[in-house]
From Swiss-Prot:
GO terms for cellular component: extracellular region. Residues 75-86 have a biased composition (Polar residues). This is Anticoagulant salivary protein 14. Induction: Induced in salivary glands by blood feeding. Belongs to the salp14 family. Residues 91-125 are annotated as: Responsible for anticoagulant activity. Residues 101-118 have a biased composition (Basic residues). Residues 1-21 form the signal peptide. One of its GO terms (molecular function) is toxin activity.
Length: 125
């Protein structure tokens, strides 16, 4: 095995060793990630010199720092408690409201024609 082969083995061991040290694989929650909110976490990839994203398994309990709790499903934390905001289980039917009370309309009395005064009656005769 030449120098290239040896380097490949060492790099592979370093990569797998760093991933194994953090137990980085989809579907698991490493002990180092117990306080991680949501359903994903990142592990350093020494080979690519970047962070790789991993996801907790379906059914894994998840939480947000706001205090909301849920269950992981396809890499997303689906909330199981109601925080007061909308979520996929909320029904968007508005709360019933009372019908405003209508004021009773006063019935208008028909005005009787004014009676002519005695003076006016005498003039017309």
């Amino acid at each position: 095995m030449g120098l290239t082969g040896t380097m490949l083995v060492l790099v592979s061991l370093a990569f797998f060793g760093s991933a194994a040290a953090h137990n980085c694989q989809n579907g698991t929650r490493p002990a180092s990630e117990q306080d991680r909110e949501g359903c994903d976490y990142y592990c350093w990839n020494a080979e690519t010199k970047s962070w790789d994203q991993f996801f907790f398994g379906n059914g894994e309990k998840c939480f947000y720092n706001s205090g909301d709790h849920g269950t992981c499903q396809n890499g997303e934390c689906h909330l199981t408690n109601n925080s007061g905001g909308p979520n996929e289980t909320d029904d968007y039917t508005p709360a019933p409201t009372e019908k405003p009370k209508q004021k009773k309309k006063k019935t208008k009395k028909t005005k009787k024609p004014k009676r002519k005064s005695k003076k006016d009656q005498e003039k017309n005769l």
